């Protein structure tokens, strides 16, 4: 009759392949009819962990023999405290043994804990059992340790193979690190195996899957096969794991935010001066060709900060001594600007009180007269006589008020026509006195100077007199066209404004129709007038009305 063993796994979190986390039970096969006769009564592997935890909970909840004995004595009426109980000594001895066991486990690196969900005891293995990493220059010792560790793991696996039953079904898989044979299922409880351990397990299963029985000859051949093929791979894998752990430990940590310091300038400058003395910091900044005096400021500018999304953001250091000086200078400049503005406002108020004209208006008038003189305007002489004005100022028009303010210059401007299409008189008449006079572009001055040079060169030659007369005639025609376009544009703008007001008063709901009609009218009233001079491309005029 064959003997079968059942293994139950206590829910271990760290390493499920530890022998302390498994319980072995001997099973006697139950006689069954048919093909199921002589099959081992193995537990259900799908609910393996829950079944074992419930079994442990039931065992822990069962009362001990001492408690049952005391209960019987209480029911019999012999519950006397003076009588010596033979089981009291047993309980005391049991407690002492439990204390010794806990001290032994603490010394070995085990700590006992209780799972809140399953109420089942479990052992948490500390990380002190792991092998230490070799220091720099101890590569030979590390390789020897790897081979020693691989050899010992192979020996352990072979010892576990020898403990297996001799007869077992061939389709059952075998875990070297759990020392158990189990039917092939999707759920396998050796989850925390390394890559090398999985390779050894796979090779052993391939070797044992071909035979139903295990002999000493098979074990010896398996030993040779594992020693020749798997010791090197296990050592190599362990070495690679050590190097990966080293890289993770040597990886730079994330930058922390600078702590708030009551005197951050001195601390920051001290830190930078210490770095500047070191050779590594100087080697880093050689590519920038930074002098030692400018080194702290350059190093602060090179500081970068990464956001959570990974975007690089330059972090300006506001506590640098040089940046503090720059900020002070900017504050002083802003204060001086404010003082100037306040003084100008006071001067304007005084000039308006005394003369009736603000200082800004007087500046506008001066600039306008300069531009007019550049375009060919001649100032009136002393003998110029103004037209008479009525005595009652309440009846004066806007033009009469301006004649009174500006004098003979305004009267001379009414009859003045500049050499180009930009009508300076219209801009002057439309000015209210509060808005500044703005020229169209400074390019008109440069264009006028260039054209005068060209005309002087042409006039020097006697053959081109007819050409000059043609150019002057074309210029007069251009002025007339520009005036016609300007007048038509003003009338169309007034008509569109009146139509818009009428449509707004009539209906608020037809806003979309109004927008369409307005866009159509604006496109209908637009006229493109282009005047092309074949000689000068810069003087071509394109007017949109």
Swiss-Prot record:
Name assigned to this protein: Protein hrde-4
Disruption phenotype: Mortal germline (Mrt) phenotype in which there is a progressive decline in fertility with each generation at 25 degrees Celsius.
Location of the region described as Disordered in the Swiss-Prot/TrEMBL record: 108-150, 236-290, 430-461, 493-545
GO biological process, one term: regulatory ncRNA-mediated gene silencing
Biased composition (Polar residues): 111-120, 508-517
Top-rank taxon: Eukaryota
Gene that encodes the chain: hrde-4
Function: May play a role in transgenerational epigenetic inheritance.
Coiled-coil region(s): 325-354
Keyword Manganese recorded: no
